[in-house]
Amino acid sequence: MHRHEVREHAEVRHLSHFNSLFTGWGSRVYDVVMVRLTRRLYQRVIADLAALRLVEGKVLDAGTGPGTLVRELARRLPGLQVYGIDLSEDMIGIARAHARREQLEERVQFESGDVGHLPYPDQSFDVVVSTISMHHWYELEQPLRELYRVLRPGGRLWIYDFRFVKAQTLEKAKALTPFAETTLKHRLVRTGRSPFALYRCFALQKTAQRDHQQD
């Protein structure tokens, strides 16, 4: 089997795995079960964002799922405009339904899309966060390029994922992107005693200077 055929086969398997977890019945189960298991992590993310003391600005949640974090941020940090994107149209449908029911439609925006091809202009966001999503990404280089592109100069990227996600994996991908000249910081985040209580947070910051064009 040629290399491109191996890659295509891997992409098909990855898409099949994604569809089984995050579409149809799977999306509804995720909305009920995983959101409860990760609630304390979301509280930690909100606290981290609050510590920045942003009076106003835009925040993107990449891999937002049913939009729980986006809605919580809108309630807790009313000066921010909060956006969420997810590859699953079913998840985005759930997120929008929750926002309507909670009367948050004017405070939040949800889009269906790929983190590797974000539908936002350059330098759109002050902060991009991603929770329990990166380990599902088929590859890391293109998503990192896109996340860099949509960050404003000085903007921050925070990726929270399970403890088993290693910094070396992200470092290797980072070296191939405009983030290459920035330092990857990472730390363990404890949110309780449950099996879903220990996470790893990866932090990158875009340079404050205006960037020259990079391919």
PLM features: residue spans?
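Conserved alpha-helix/loop element of class I SAM-dependent methyltransferases that forms part
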Residues: 38-56
